[in-house]
Amino acid sequence: MNILFAVSECVPFIKSGGLADVAGALPKELKKLGVNVRIMLPNYSLIPANLRESFKLHKVIHVPLGWRNQYCGILKGEQDGITYYLIDNEYYFKRDSLYGHYDDGERFSFFSKAILESIPYLDFEVDLIHSHDWHTAMVNFLLHEKYKDNPLYEKIKTVYTIHNLQFQGVFPREVIHDLLELGDEYFNSEQLEFYGNINFMKGGIIAADHITTVSSTYKEEIQYEFFGEKLDGLLRKYNDKLSGIVNGIDTSVYNPRLDSYITATYDVDTLYAKRENKWALQHYFGLPEKENTPIISMVTRLTKQKGLDLVRAVFQEIMQEDVQCIILGSGDSEYEQFFEWMAYEYSEKVKVYIGFNEELAHQVYAGSDLFLMPSLFEPCGLGQLIALTYGVIPIVRETGGLNDTVKSYHVETKSGNGFTFTNFNAHDMLYTVRRALRYYEDPAVWNQLVKQAMTEDHSWKTSALAYKDLYNRLLKLS
């Protein structure tokens, strides 16, 4: 089977969030299962030159966009055995950031149309298009409404993955006529209309042959008003074509036994080496090098979604415990300033790195004991999966992918891989942190918990098998 991934970002070329990690790792795992996957993304000027230089011009076409025919170069290259196509147009993709521009509706209308217009010119007969998030959602809708009468397209199936329902691609009504070349009959509540505007994600949901989300719990949550971002009714309507497949992590990147970024490599049989990473982390941040004081870390975007209001509410109570705390991330200024203030107030216990540093992030995972992730909502989450892989015990709220991947430890049955709480409540979180700290004081219990976490499989293998089965069912190959 031939699968075309349509994505707005992809590791190793360009990344702004978890979508890029998925687009980079899942195709590699699918390839191991015999699936022929190719990936199409924009040729951003921000892609490093050393990654771009191996691409060759495959074809030049023109994409109809309203009254214009826009230049579209199709570049072709290979990376790690996977074929990639870059859609080239400097007007749309030579920018200083991936998103957040006044003409994003036009940019990704062009990209969606370019994907479809390029299909006849690829040396690759596309059986199924797998699109992701709002940026390529209209591929599904346009394919269904404008291209299906063409024999080249009539058999193509679509899978649409929602990574984060919060970002939907909502644009003025004029986009329907001026860019998508669709008539007024599509501007109604059963089609693209969304509170007076149009909604790309809504179009993707309506037209896709199947919809996936990035965890089973998130699939259920988004059908309720609290999580549904005004699309919960639509998702309930299409529940029969909606499923949840939890993400994995790329174990060629996140593997403490092979990680070149950390001070000392280790695995479940050489856990004694993990303490060297803890000492190195304490030394790097200027923390007292105390082996028996647990390090609680957060590697995260500093935003409301990540549950930082809970952390802020009880942080000073956490500081009354014998702990050290390391925060790595950037985001909203109110949270950045709060953690910088805490680092000043508790200079012997709290250290903060505002920004992101890939090498340092690996060292934080390797050197920490506990990983705090009390999200308000979390479609899947990668941080807790990386933490488990590195033997760092997560403390999470039971939402989305956190609920699917972290199970609370029970001392009687010795089951579980972390500590969880249900309500979005600061003192529930505080109680759970204190509970985890009590177990940390018992080395026998803690070592067993760490080993259980590290022996779980959080790779993409299980997820890739689920996606292959889904593709097979849609293509009726099984």
Swiss-Prot record:
Question: What role does it play?
Answer: Synthesizes alpha-1,4-glucan chains using ADP-glucose.
Reactions the enzyme catalyzes: [(1->4)-alpha-D-glucosyl](n) + ADP-alpha-D-glucose = [(1->4)-alpha-D-glucosyl](n+1) + ADP + H(+)
Keywords, in A-Z order? Glycogen biosynthesis, Glycosyltransferase, Transferase
What CDD domains does the record tag this protein with? Answer: GT5_Glycogen_synthase_DULL1-like (cd03791)
Q: Give the family, as the similarity comment puts it.
A: Belongs to the glycosyltransferase 1 family. Bacterial/plant glycogen synthase subfamily.
- Lineage top rank: taxon: Bacteria
A Pfam match: Glycos_transf_1
Q: In which pathway does it act?
A: Glycan biosynthesis; glycogen biosynthesis
- Provide the taxonomic classification: Bacteria, Bacillati, Bacillota, Bacilli, Bacillales
**Native organism:** Bacillus cytotoxicus (strain DSM 22905 / CIP 110041 / 391-98 / NVH 391-98)
Amino-acid positions noted as binding ADP-alpha-D-glucose in the UniProt annotation, renumbered to this chain: 15
Task: From the Swiss-Prot or TrEMBL record, give the protein name.
Answer: Glycogen synthase
**One GO MF term, please?**
alpha-1,4-glucan glucosyltransferase (ADP-glucose donor) activity
The first-level EC class reads: transferase
Q: Mind listing the GO biological process terms from this record?
A: glycogen biosynthetic process
The protein's matches in Gene3D superfamilies, at most eight in alphabetical order, are given as: Glycogen Phosphorylase B (3.40.50.2000)
